[in-house]
Amino acid sequence: MSFDSVPRHALSMRFDLEPPSHASAAHRVAVLLVNLGTPDAPTPRAVRRYLAQFLSDPRVVEIPQLVWQVILRTLILPLRGRASAKKYAAVWLPEGSPLRVYTERQVESVKPLFAANGYRVIVDYAMRYGTPSIADVLAQLKRAGAERVLLLPMYPQYSSSTTATAFDAAFAALGRMRNQPEVRTVRHYADHPAYIHALAEQVRQYWAAHGRPAFDAGDKLVLSFHGVPKRTLDLGDPYHDQCQQTAALLMSALGLTTFECRVTFQSRFGKAEWLQPYTAPTLKELGAAGVRRADVFCPGFTADCLETIEEIGIEVRDAFVHGGGKEFHRIPCLNASPAWIAALGEIAAENLQGWPVRVAMAPEAVS
């Protein structure tokens, strides 16, 4: 049988339809910031749709999918959808979901930084779950002429359930492309000096505006990272070690000791053992032990979201106060702070080396 007799669509059905390639097309470079995701609206239906996608990821829930899907569809989604929607509604901003709003601000803030330093790059963002999806944004970048893409996860510490699954989604999208762009990935930046500096600046600026804890009197700074099941540590995931590394570097930058600063893990899901100590019980214990003031900062979250605004700002605060604590402070995440935007630019620039991203700058721009 000749290939001439086979319908064209049958030969290319594995791959997305693409326009003809032209040698004269723009050869552009893109930086794609990737975050976890968020529901499109604070409604039970939207939240259930988001949770179904998120909790169906085998890198997030590592149990047999046939068993898990029955539990997820019959128990978890019906129960958690409405309860989670109420929590999202409590933190929803006029512009939309906090995570999406702050991520968009990061993109818009880093664009002029690149331009001012002579970089001609496209900057955009995508979400691993929900919209805009990684596949859709990669397709948009291709249509804009991007032939090289830097994937920059907004997860400073590597984990299979965050960084790796974002890369999975990107590579799956690439697998459907006939004409693939060149791709680089940033695995982690848990110990990057610019990231640590941005964290320290965020804490210092908060204390400058709201007062520094009286560490000599027993006040505490708690560094709360997102938790993961403990078995992932036993299976070789480096997340726990990188969280501890970030915490140690941040404490050093702030001049604090392990007596003044605690490291905890939040957002436990299910009954399995997760990384410990858990954040809410630790804050309750601190309050019961007579700690007057506790400041909580989340170094692993680069943008404020449900887990920081609601879980830390309401649930963990209540645990501390009910335990006997008097003064609770939630230090905002990096969001679009100048130090963090500068760090993003620096991390991206290091990973763009060798790609044609620089343009000639006018003498007055250089001086």
Curated annotation (Swiss-Prot):
<keyword id="KW-0408">Iron</keyword>
<keyword id="KW-0627">Porphyrin biosynthesis</keyword>
<dbReference type="Pfam" id="PF00762">
    <property type="entry name" value="Ferrochelatase"/>
</dbReference>
<comment type="pathway">
    <text>Porphyrin-containing compound metabolism; protoheme biosynthesis; protoheme from protoporphyrin-IX: step 1/1.</text>
</comment>
<feature type="binding site">
    <location>
        <position position="307"/>
    </location>
    <ligand>
        <name>Fe cation</name>
    </ligand>
</feature>
<comment type="function">
    <text>Catalyzes the ferrous insertion into protoporphyrin IX.</text>
</comment>
<keyword id="KW-0350">Heme biosynthesis</keyword>
<dbReference type="GO" id="GO:0004325">
    <property type="term" value="F:ferrochelatase activity"/>
</dbReference>
<feature type="binding site">
    <location>
        <position position="226"/>
    </location>
    <ligand>
        <name>Fe cation</name>
    </ligand>
</feature>
<dbReference type="InterPro" id="IPR033659">
    <property type="entry name" value="Ferrochelatase_N"/>
</dbReference>
<keyword id="KW-0479">Metal-binding</keyword>
<dbReference type="InterPro" id="IPR033644">
    <property type="entry name" value="Ferrochelatase_C"/>
</dbReference>
<keyword id="KW-0456">Lyase</keyword>
<comment type="similarity">
    <text>Belongs to the ferrochelatase family.</text>
</comment>
<dbReference type="GO" id="GO:0005737">
    <property type="term" value="C:cytoplasm"/>
</dbReference>
<dbReference type="GO" id="GO:0006783">
    <property type="term" value="P:heme biosynthetic process"/>
</dbReference>
<dbReference type="InterPro" id="IPR001015">
    <property type="entry name" value="Ferrochelatase"/>
</dbReference>
<dbReference type="InterPro" id="IPR019772">
    <property type="entry name" value="Ferrochelatase_AS"/>
</dbReference>
<protein>
    <recommendedName>
        <fullName>Ferrochelatase</fullName>
        <ecNumber>4.98.1.1</ecNumber>
    </recommendedName>
</protein>
<keyword id="KW-0963">Cytoplasm</keyword>
<dbReference type="GO" id="GO:0046872">
    <property type="term" value="F:metal ion binding"/>
</dbReference>
